[in-house]
Design a protein with these regions (language model features):
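Conserved helicase motor core of SF1/SF2 NTP-dependent helicases
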Residues: 7-13, 38-41, 196-282, 302-310
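Short coil/turn segments at beta-strand junctions that form active-site/ligand-binding loops
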Residues: 31-32, 61, 185-189, 214, ...
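Conserved interdomain hinge at the start of the Helicase C-terminal
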Residues: 287-299
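Short, polar/flexible loop-turn hinges at active-site or ligand-entry regions and domain interfaces
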Residues: 28-32, 53-61, 78-91, 98-104, ...
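A short helix-to-beta-strand connector/capping loop
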Residues: 56-63, 242-243, 280-286
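P-loop NTPase Walker
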Residues: 1-81, 259-262
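Accessory N-terminal region flanking or inserted into the helicase ATPase core
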Residues: 1-10, 14-15, 32-34, 105-191, ...
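Short, well-ordered alpha-helices that flank and scaffold nucleotide-derived cofactor binding pockets
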Residues: 18-25, 48-52, 174-181, 204-211
């Protein structure tokens, strides 16, 4: 698996699409190319850009331009009626005396599932995504339930699914991994975007795809990993075997912001060292004491909040 490290604004997705173009120029069938991302937004953007750029039908020609987890879910032999739904969670809730959230849709984002589930279900599924014991995760994080309650729900949840031959979202990912030799498609080349955000369980899917692909390229930036809370294993991306390259020119970050950003990333203890050049523009960095001091009525704004405060 060849890694492409892309600092902010260096064009990771564009670089991957240029490589898609090279494959198409060589005569590779579009359906023998997989372009996979962590979020639906990134996957859909790549699909739309590829359809327009290469004059392809997004549904017929680019069916493998999608999220990594949606590919895995679509390739299992689990039928729709076997998937845990709202009615199943309601029935289980009545049996155990604890109200649980209903099941997310199959095209939901993994990070949305982690933030919307009941805290106990969240803990159970996050432990599975991280491939660690539920007790270990419970000991490492805060949850407003005692261990006996968490363990009780965990055991009841497993028994309910087993008894009724039902699967949840994470079960379907595991099913793909367990049967990857049979259910994973074969590709000429696989492109993986946002690789820094994959959990250990998703990395198992990525490695299964690597085995079924003649070539595989994984693009990402460990400095931009924002989904550790959802199980992202950034260190796995950094430690992958194989060659790599770093995109060295940003087309987004001006000089003044680049200087501040470099000071901040220098505080990160475990990272892949990267050098890149800012775009030829000074830009500006301003320190604002209160958000009310900013006129948000014009232009586009990206506001980052820390610890839920804004």
């Amino acid at each position: 698996m060849f890694r492409i490290f892309g600092p902010p604004g260096t064009g990771k997705t564009t670089t991957l699409l240029n490589m898609v173009d090279e494959q198409l120029q060589k005569g590779t069938n579009p359906n023998h190319i997989a372009f996979l991302a962590f979020t639906k937004k990134a996957a859909n953007e790549a699909k739309e850009r590829a359809a327009k750029r290469f004059n392809l039908d997004p549904d017929e020609d680019l069916c493998f331009f999608r999220t990594l987890h949606s590919l895995a879910l679509s390739m299992t032999e689990i039928r729709t009626e076997q998937v845990m739904s709202g009615i199943h969670y309601q029935e289980l809730s009545k049996k155990i005396g604890i109200s649980l959230s209903k099941s997310p849709s199959l095209d939901a984002e993994i990070q949305d599932i982690q933030s919307n589930d009941h805290p106990i279900l969240n803990t159970i599924n996050l432990a599975r995504l991280k491939k660690i014991d539920v007790r270990q995760l419970y000991n490492e994080t805060y949850i407003e339930y005692d261990w006996n309650t968490v363990n009780y729900v965990h055991q009841c949840y497993k028994e309910y699914k087993l008894k009724n031959n039902l699967y949840d979202f994470t079960d379907m990912l595991q099913s793909f991994i367990d049967s990857a030799d049979q259910c994973c498609p074969t590709f000429q080349v696989t492109f993986l975007d946002e690789a820094q955000d994959l959990s250990p369980l998703q990395w198992d899917i990525a490695h299964a795809l690597d085995k079924k692909s003649k070539f595989m390229f994984a693009a990402g930036d460990d400095d931009q990993a924002i989904y550790r809370w959802a199980g992202a294993d950034v260190e796995h991306f950094i430690a992958l075997d194989g060659s790599s390259e770093t995109l060295s020119q940003s087309f987004r970050v001006p000089r003044s912001i680049h200087a501040v950003a470099e000071q901040i990333v220098g505080r990160i203890k475990h990272r892949y060292p990267k050098r890149y050049q800012p775009k030829d523009e000074n830009g500006s960095v301003k320190h604002i004491a209160r958000i009310d001091d900013i006129d948000l009525s014009e232009g586009q704004w990206l506001i980052m909040a820390q610890a839920g405060y804004i």
